[in-house]
């Protein structure tokens, strides 16, 4: 009997291999699966109960444009109606990000003590590490003040704007993404339309 067993010489394969590193996303191969790494996000639908309106973004979205470029009735559309969204920065909580994004994108400053509920986190999809927290934010009159939004200086924010929509028009909204549809449905259920 041999004192030493021969060990098969296999190259070590790391569990994670970086395929692409971008400004907003990375692609990695992990356990033989290509995975998108994107920052976690928040999605917010502010609802002004006393004014019977809610706030949405008419947002410049090149990804939607790219997907629709071969559709004759959609190829000229540059801005799409969505809820307010934003990335959670390092060290931020979802609550803090909601307050920051509301300020940056809409100019809404919430009172510091105003409480709100956040749902989540939910994974965006099966091949993405990003998780999203969602918030249907009911705002009574004295819970906020509104100023001109400072924006974050990005091209998307320069070409986008927030608009107030009457709750009477809630059933006319064309939803372009699942998160917006989810929050609009929550609003419809809340107001009983």
Task: Identify the residue ranges that each predicted region occupies.
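Short, hydrophobic/amphipathic alpha-helical patches that form generic packing surfaces
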Residues: 181-192
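Short acidic, gly/pro-rich beta-turn/loop elements at beta-sheet edges
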Residues: 54, 66, 144-147
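Unchanged
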Residues: 41-43, 75-178
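Glycine-rich, pocket-lining loop/helix-strand segments that form or immediately flank
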Residues: 56-85
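Short Lys/Arg-enriched alpha/beta "domain-start" segment
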Residues: 1-11
């Amino acid at each position: 009997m041999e004192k030493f067993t021969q060990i098969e010489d296999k190259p070590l394969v790391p569990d994670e291999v970086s395929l692409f590193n971008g400004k907003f996303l990375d692609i990695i191969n992990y356990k033989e699966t290509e995975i998108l790494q994107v920052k976690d996000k928040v999605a917010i639908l502010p609802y002004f109960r006393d004014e019977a309106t809610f706030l949405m973004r008419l947002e410049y979205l090149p990804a939607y444009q790219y997907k629709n470029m071969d559709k004759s009735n959609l190829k000229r559309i540059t801005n799409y109606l969505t809820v307010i969204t934003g990335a959670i920065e390092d060290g931020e909580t979802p609550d803090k990000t909601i307050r920051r994004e509301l300020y940056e994108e809409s100019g809404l400053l919430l009172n510091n003590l105003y409480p709100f509920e956040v749902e989540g986190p939910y994974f965006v999809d099966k091949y993405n590490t990003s998780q999203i927290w969602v918030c249907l934010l009911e705002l009574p009159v004295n819970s906020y003040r509104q100023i001109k939004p400072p924006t974050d200086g990005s091209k998307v924010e320069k070409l986008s704007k927030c608009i107030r929509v009457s709750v009477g028009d809630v059933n006319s909204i064309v939803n372009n993404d699942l998160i917006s549809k989810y929050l609009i449905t929550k609003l419809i259920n809340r107001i009983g339309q």
